[in-house]
Amino acid sequence: MSKAVVVFSGGQDSTTCLIQALNQYDEVHAVTFDYGQRHSEEIATAAKLAKDLKVDSHKILDVTVLNELAISALTRDAIPVSNELMDNGLPNTFVPGRNILFLTLAGIYAYQLGAESVITGVCETDFSGYPDCRDSFIKAMQSALEQGMDRELKLVTPLMWLNKAQTWALADKYHSLELVRDQTLTCYNGIVGSGCGTCPACLLRAKGLNDYLDDKAGVMAELDAKC
């Protein structure tokens, strides 16, 4: 029996990964991390989606210690989300160590469950300047987890080389475009669905959707060539 753990935030990318996993694995477990993020709606959205999609289990882990250590627009209400990069070249929504922590804990959970895969929706094509969304980082994390736990564990990144239009096409391939469009939360301002329309996450999401809707056949062909 094939088993997977999906790192699940309730956003567009992780929901698309979860839907794909439900079609590819016999048993799928979702794990959501409460790190004191800007909007608690993210946790509620993930819980509702996990229930509606009938995952085998959904675990919400309290990792609010990350909030104490990582200063970011996503962990501090007093820091407004900016469309400009900081002096270090990173967006101010970058939470240092977040994916290191999430993948480590998801890997431990996978070990407990006997799951062979941890699935995450990180993407280098549209990685928004986050260093912990790069393929090189994922490969390094997989190596560290396998060595540290002395067992094979695959970090699966279905979206790594997809642009946002192709990610929308992937949701549509599983007949879930409307669900992802209307019920996920990607917005940095905590608005489900189309979001605020002005934050970086909403702008990237909307552009990808428009690009897909403008050329469905072409984008789907690009997706099929990559998958």
Curated annotation (Swiss-Prot):
<dbReference type="GO" id="GO:0016879">
    <property type="term" value="F:ligase activity, forming carbon-nitrogen bonds"/>
</dbReference>
<comment type="pathway">
    <text>Purine metabolism; 7-cyano-7-deazaguanine biosynthesis.</text>
</comment>
<feature type="binding site">
    <location>
        <position position="196"/>
    </location>
    <ligand>
        <name>Zn(2+)</name>
    </ligand>
</feature>
<feature type="binding site">
    <location>
        <position position="199"/>
    </location>
    <ligand>
        <name>Zn(2+)</name>
    </ligand>
</feature>
<dbReference type="GO" id="GO:0005524">
    <property type="term" value="F:ATP binding"/>
</dbReference>
<protein>
    <recommendedName>
        <fullName>7-cyano-7-deazaguanine synthase</fullName>
        <ecNumber>6.3.4.20</ecNumber>
    </recommendedName>
</protein>
<feature type="binding site">
    <location>
        <position position="187"/>
    </location>
    <ligand>
        <name>Zn(2+)</name>
    </ligand>
</feature>
<dbReference type="GO" id="GO:0008270">
    <property type="term" value="F:zinc ion binding"/>
</dbReference>
<keyword id="KW-0479">Metal-binding</keyword>
<keyword id="KW-0862">Zinc</keyword>
<feature type="binding site">
    <location>
        <position position="202"/>
    </location>
    <ligand>
        <name>Zn(2+)</name>
    </ligand>
</feature>
<dbReference type="InterPro" id="IPR018317">
    <property type="entry name" value="QueC"/>
</dbReference>
<keyword id="KW-0547">Nucleotide-binding</keyword>
<dbReference type="GO" id="GO:0008616">
    <property type="term" value="P:queuosine biosynthetic process"/>
</dbReference>
<keyword id="KW-0067">ATP-binding</keyword>
<comment type="function">
    <text>Catalyzes the ATP-dependent conversion of 7-carboxy-7-deazaguanine (CDG) to 7-cyano-7-deazaguanine (preQ(0)).</text>
</comment>
<comment type="similarity">
    <text>Belongs to the QueC family.</text>
</comment>
<keyword id="KW-0436">Ligase</keyword>
<dbReference type="InterPro" id="IPR014729">
    <property type="entry name" value="Rossmann-like_a/b/a_fold"/>
</dbReference>
<keyword id="KW-0671">Queuosine biosynthesis</keyword>
<feature type="binding site">
    <location>
        <begin position="8"/>
        <end position="18"/>
    </location>
    <ligand>
        <name>ATP</name>
    </ligand>
</feature>
<dbReference type="Pfam" id="PF06508">
    <property type="entry name" value="QueC"/>
</dbReference>
